[in-house]
Amino acid sequence: MDLAYVCEWEKWAKSTYCPSLPLACAWSCRNLIAFTTDLRNDDQDLTHMIHILDTEHPWEVHSVSSGHSEAITCLEWDQSGSRLLSADADGQIKCWSMADHLANSWESSVGSQVEGDPIVALSWLHNGVKLALHVEKSGASSFGEKFSRVKFSPSLTLFGGKPMEGWIAVTVSGLVTVSLLKPSGQVLTSTESLCRLRGRVALADIAFTGGGNIVVAAADGSSASPVKFYKVCVSVVSEKCRIDTEILPSLFMRCTTDPNRKDRFPAITHLKFLARDMSEQVLLCASSQTSSLVECWSLRKEGLPVNNIFQQISPVVGDKQPMILKWRILSATNDLDRVSAVALPKLPISLTNTDLKVASDTQFYPGLGLALAFQDGSVHMVHRLSLQTMAVFYSSAPRSLDEPALKRPRTTCPAVHFKAMQLSWTSLALVGIDNHGKLSMLRISPSLGHPLEPKLALQHLLFLLEYCMVTGYDWWDILLHVQPGMVQSLVERLHEEYTRQKPALQQVLSTRILAMKASLCKLSPCTVARVCDYHTKLFLMAITSTLKSLLRPHFLNTPDKSPGDRLAEICAKITDVDIDKVMINLKTEEFVLDMNTLQALQQLLQWVGDFVLYLLVSLPNQGSPLRPGHSFLRDGTSLGMLRELMVVIRIWGLLKPSCLPVYTATSDTQDSMSLLFRLLTKLWICCRDEGAASEPDEGLVDECCLLPSQLLVPNLDWLPASDGLVSRLQPKQPLRLRFGRAPTLPSSTSTLQLDGLTRAPGQPKIDHLRRLHLGAYPTEECKACTRCGCVTMLKSPNKTTAVTQWEQRWIKNCLCGGLWRRVPLSCS
């Protein structure tokens, strides 16, 4: 474990902070982190803020004045990572969602309330989606064998089996409240007592069973009292939410039954199920003022012994022993320093003895450890069942040591320690919020302190990348562990595994793997130019599918193939270098579009024409792999797409000449489209068959050498060099950052002076998705991708149906799958 970066507040007067209040923290599958702080202003009023940041740009924190009247006690992300629940000590629950799908713009439109009753536990209802990781099958060829869907029922279903959305919360007075979000937007809320005899609930946690039930664990805070468990069933009867509860077996902590320890740990300070969908295992922590003890318990079915008298009366009873559920302790720690925070892994690894042995044999450790933070400032990763220490992180010297002795607080514990922690979704990173509001990001090695061969470490990272590819989770935390020397191997292995999948699955994952390769290639100076190629291929695939979708069959009773499919088939069959001869074989009536639509598409068509020209001009320099676009010169599939688009553009140009790409030629009589199509076809013929690519002949190379003297080659605006952190982080050299202040980061591998990547200050900007020029200092509000840096305008300047269809693709996410964030006008 080592520190990746630390982010502090610009001005944080100690008199304005309320250290006695609890902090909450949550980490989404999209690598957004939400956390709370509580500040006093000059009037001594409390402002309960929720801070949301993207792990790649932590200084760009978005702070929301939550509107909660009391301290926020819980934060919880949904499965998609796009909505956030917050609950406070007054019983108010709010549901936050992105405004305009921007990661730094949030609004709350719905919520619920149990007035005056503090919320101690909060969770979204389970949607029935659960994946299992099969570590022992990491070498299998099919993703379906490595990651399988587990049969798991949603907490509540709508008509047709669709899971119903909503949340469940437990209050300090022993109430359970459930709110259901109907498709109409209406919220159904119901509240019920956990049991007939209500009692104080100081700590609680929520888990789900495969049968669709909910399990609540509750404790009153005293280690002398039992930890109680309840089964909660939610249903909708006559358009009203109904809650049924049932008492389950309870337990007493082991330390309370030991005469030597009975009074040493008077309070239960932490109560957690080991996983949201694992209600059979629970973690408990009992503490005194200075020390703690942690126990892990498991719920098991055991046979109930039957007295011989009853066996003689009824032999049937003796044949089939009755079974009961009973809590059994799995492990316990020795006395520890006082535990200040606990973080549990989210990686869905099974914890049966067989699976643990497999994990040990394969040396796959991510997801096996949970994190304990102590008041001495240290963090221990311990095995989630045996509780044995696997890795330790020691923070730097506490701040109080830097102060004069007279000013130091009279306390036995140091000033700085984590009050809230969360593990990432692959368990390779840990975020901690300390008692001064400072955010620390820690790398957690995949080996967790065990010696691992480099080849095996690479295999584990590949396995987790595949997991993110299948689930759609963001993989930023995996990139923290990728060294420049690993990039080439990871990209090649990832491509090999991808090509082994069925064609249908390949099509589903086609954009995700390109985005993954692009983010990997940013980490090495040898592969940084390929980042441009991968993003360009994403853009080309999007343009191709959009333009083909505009084509309509002339008659309704058409054969099975769409006009787009016929276009691809004819272009692949006819290898003629004359664009007009290829065009003759197509039914041109299928390409007829409205004139306004054609004109609105001109910028996209211009990009296609410019890119073809750029590629052909690059052909004589193909020996330079650092030049953007290099990989396209051997990519028969992409060249085939460009060839199809050139044919479509040619046909549309006959309908409306002003929609054609504009070329600046040295001769007025030159047919630029025909010239480029002829050269493009020759290049495509050389590499259209995979594995049998031939070198372009000298005649083609000579003609491409002459292109700059025949046509003016435009400057292509590649994606901007990323301003994110991950490509700039150095091992053992944590970055010191400040919230709200853009840092001066050390040079990254992607800032090398490569052709097409250099940018001078004040250089004109471009809308990367609409291909519109924004000027050197844009006046329109823009948004940028958190992952690749792609910039586009927030509001559309064009209302044409075809353009709207194109822009609808990028409403929620960038073409690489990254989230959007609003950028200031000065940064656009």
From Swiss-Prot:
Ranges for the WD repeats: 67-106, 198-240, 263-307, 621-662, 777-816
Subcellular location: Nucleus
Transmembrane segments: none
GO biological process terms on file: positive regulation of DNA-templated transcription; positive regulation of transcription elongation by RNA polymerase II; positive regulation of transcription initiation by RNA polymerase II; RNA polymerase II preinitiation complex assembly; transcription by RNA polymerase II
One GO CC term, this protein: mediator complex
Alphabetic keyword roster: Activator, Nucleus, Repeat, Transcription, Transcription regulation, WD repeat
Protein name: Mediator of RNA polymerase II transcription subunit 16
Encoding gene, per UniProt annotation: Med16
